[in-house]
Curated annotation (Swiss-Prot):
Its main location: cytoplasm. One of its GO terms (molecular function) is uroporphyrinogen decarboxylase activity. It comes from Shewanella baltica (strain OS155 / ATCC BAA-1091). One of its GO terms (cellular component) is cytosol. This is Uroporphyrinogen decarboxylase.
Length: 354
């Protein structure tokens, strides 16, 4: 593998000195870019794009051609794992992801098998190795998965949900069934992420998009417990370097201390968290990633630059901060505004790394 030319993202996650604060954007390969839309049209639909390793590589690299980003993230979807379990993933126009066969009974859960990442998910591994080769050491490659709880919400609900009624009913009326599902998902995610590292991923991220829907105690029981199991099972060294792991629970500001105890290297913060407060609470243990409101990219460029300065000042001096949005970039954002955001992070952060 080519030697890494820009490792500031990995260094910041491990709280090693950097020259400027590294920056990347969740969903940086996405619909706000005209070149992404053209490639997606070429693929036919979203999952065809994910399953074609050459096109998945192309869209992963597109934002790096435009912007001075400090990391690339694998272009894929969190629902690849349940899809590989045979649930029949499809996308309904305007409805988002759906499953033909929801996992909403204990019998359905018992029948689930753990997918082989090199077989049923081989297309993801091919994408990882292709992207790593094509990056040629320019920046690190981030691999990722959804958290067991978040994957389970889609599997039990049969798709997206605003109320999470079915999975919460299972959690409280049939907790053993849900624990069986979460356990299988944790085992699947461990294999999946370790295979991504074996194929070239240099950092890992676990997206717990719906952990914030849980009560204070239920979060620990049904989400954090299984992310802990994953972290305990991950490959943490490859190519002679540590493979940093970032946990991100959207709406997880209540639980930063508990998340920091898992042994992860960094916590992702959504835009509702004050980064200065987060650093006071857990900055001695973990790095922090975040956390500008993605909607701020609709603001005039001087306002974006002002907000970048505010967040950098909130974190303060020294390493341990990876700048990002608090969630994925919106599809109608002007690419110029995204570019101004990235430039502002690098330009304004030098003063914090003397």
């Amino acid at each position: 593998m080519a030697e890494l030319k820009n490792d500031r993202y990995l260094r910041a996650l491990l709280k090693e000195p950097v020259d400027v604060t590294p920056v990347w954007m969740m969903r940086q390969a996405g619909r706000y870019l005209p070149e992404y839309k053209a490639t997606r049209a070429q693929a036919g639909d979203f999952m065809s794009l994910c399953k074609n390793h050459e096109l998945a590589c192309e869209v992963t690299l597109q934002p790096l051609r435009r912007y001075d980003l400090d990391a690339a993230i694998l272009f894929s979807d969190i629902l690849t794992v349940p899809d590989a379990m045979g649930l029949g993933l499809y996308f309904e126009a305007g409805e988002g992801p759906r499953f033909e066969r929801p996992t909403d009974t204990i019998d359905a859960i018992k029948k689930l098998s753990i997918p082989d990442p090199e077989d049923e998910l081989g297309y993801v591994m091919k994408a990882v190795s292709t992207i790593r080769r094509e990056l040629n050491g320019a920046v690190p490659l981030i691999g990722f998965s959804g958290s067991p709880w978040t994957l389970a919400t889609y599997m039990v609900e049969g798709g997206s949900s605003k109320t999470f009624e079915k999975i919460k009913k299972m959690a409280y009326a049939e907790p053993m069934a849900l624990h069986m599902l979460l356990d299988k998902l944790a085992d699947s995610v461990i294999l999946y992420l370790n295979a991504q590292v074996a194929n070239g991923a240099q950092s890992l991220m676990i997206f717990d998009s719906w952990g914030g829907a849980l009560s204070h105690s239920a979060y620990r029981e049904f989400s954090l417990r299984y992310m802990q199991k994953i972290i305990d099972g991950l490959t943490r060294f490859a190519d002679g370097r540590k493979v940093p792991v970032t946990l991100f629970t959207k709406g997880g500001g209540l639980w930063l201390e508990a998340m920091a105890e898992t042994g992860c290297d960094a916590l992702g913060l959504d835009w509702t968290v004050d980064i200065a407060d987060a650093r006071r609470r857990v900055g001695h243990k973990v790095a922090l990633q975040g956390n500008m409101d993605p909607s701020m990219l609709y603001a005039p460029i001087p306002r974006i630059e002002e907000e970048v300065g505010h967040i950098l000042a909130g974190y303060g001096e020294g390493t341990g901060h990876v700048f990002n949005l608090g969630h994925g970039i919106h599809q109608h954002v002007d690419p110029e505004h995204a570019g101004a955001f990235i430039k502002a992070v690098h330009a304004q952060s030098k003063q914090y790394h003397k």
